[in-house]
């Protein structure tokens, strides 16, 4: 019931304040509510809604353990790196939601990631797999193509254009994406002392990256290329974009060894083989001052506080990469052959020989596909033309090019092959006409 005093003054039905004591009184059928009570109700409902949404978000966002388990399905080894990445990514996306939905005096800053590891150790693949799991837009950029504004090359904003394109120009979605910047070690300045000469592809690029790494409203040319004053720009906030920078940082292990007191030269030098002292073990002892000595500027180091180190892949790890992950190369080729009704088998010695070749070429996991293509070329050329091929066995001799793969023919093989491409095209033309 609406409240009235003797002078018929209207009062709020909830707090009892008169219309003179509040800014506004809203009337309903037999009831009144003041602006203060409306605001209080709104806050209560909003808090409850936020709590429900936060709980839902907590259920949706995988825990660090779940993230690592997913990475384990696709990436062999690198357990230490996967653990650090899992925690970092979880905290990053938890921070985004918390900031979006709650007013708080404590602002949690973004923590970008720096990955160090030899070529082919899985840096790019780890970042790609994370984006796949979280279903967020993902873009890869090559730091060596970037130059600072005013010089020939790509502006740093073009990195963001790739992310926007991968998000189908949904800016809000792109603003929660992941950007992987490869070859970041190649933009180290030539010396750890500032130089009076201009370093447009080194220190200059590091300086240009600072703003987007930290968080800024960036103006991105929609067609890419250089900015000019008369074109329209896409505005994107980089505050919640996770940047993962990766590089081999060749030679940084010597800087680390010098710092921790290991002798690398001289008569009394401690001599250890690479097997005894793995580069990965040395890299784990990295400190910010080592990156500074390498040529990264202090401001850049400060914006990538999480450092992840990866181990070089040994023979055993490379064999596992060939066979164990969900999308392992051996499984991919077996599926390709199965499409033509052919079974594909790799002998154990053949897999070992493939791993040895990758180590010899110093290409890590990245070089495995190229080696496989070389081995399989002739067989893949013949199979589509011969319906009687039942099985192919890849031997060590085939990998070393001392012999051809073993091809087993079955004259009685019955194959229900899909219509040839030419036939299917003719059928499609007939249907259209």
Swiss-Prot record:
Residues 1-53 form the ClpX-type ZB domain. It comes from the Bacteria. SMART domains: AAA, ClpB_D2-small, zf-C4_ClpX. GO terms for cellular component: HslUV protease complex. GO terms for molecular function: ATP binding; ATP hydrolysis activity; ATP-dependent protein folding chaperone; protein dimerization activity; unfolded protein binding; zinc ion binding. Zn(2+) binds at residues 12, 15, 34, 37. Signal peptide: none annotated. One of its GO terms (biological process) is proteolysis involved in protein catabolic process. Keywords: ATP-binding, Chaperone, Metal-binding, Nucleotide-binding, Zinc. It holds the Pfam family ClpB_D2-small. InterPro entries: AAA+_ATPase, ATP-dep_Clp_protease_ClpX, ATPase_AAA_core, Clp_ATPase_C, Clp_protease_ATP-bd_su_ClpX, ClpX_bact, P-loop_NTPase, Znf_CppX_C4. The keyword Repeat does not apply. ATP binds at residues 118-125. Gene3D superfamilies: 1.10.8.60, ClpX chaperone, C4-type zinc finger domain (6.20.220.10), P-loop containing nucleotide triphosphate hydrolases (3.40.50.300). The keyword Phosphoprotein does not apply. Component of the ClpX-ClpP complex. Forms a hexameric ring that, in the presence of ATP, binds to fourteen ClpP subunits assembled into a disk-like structure with a central cavity, resembling the structure of eukaryotic proteasomes. Belongs to the ClpX chaperone family. ATP-dependent specificity component of the Clp protease. It directs the protease to specific substrates. Can perform chaperone functions in the absence of ClpP. NCBIfam families: clpX, PRK05342.1. This is ATP-dependent Clp protease ATP-binding subunit ClpX. The lineage of its organism: Bacteria, Bacillati, Bacillota, Bacillota incertae sedis, Caldicellulosiruptorales. The gene is clpX.
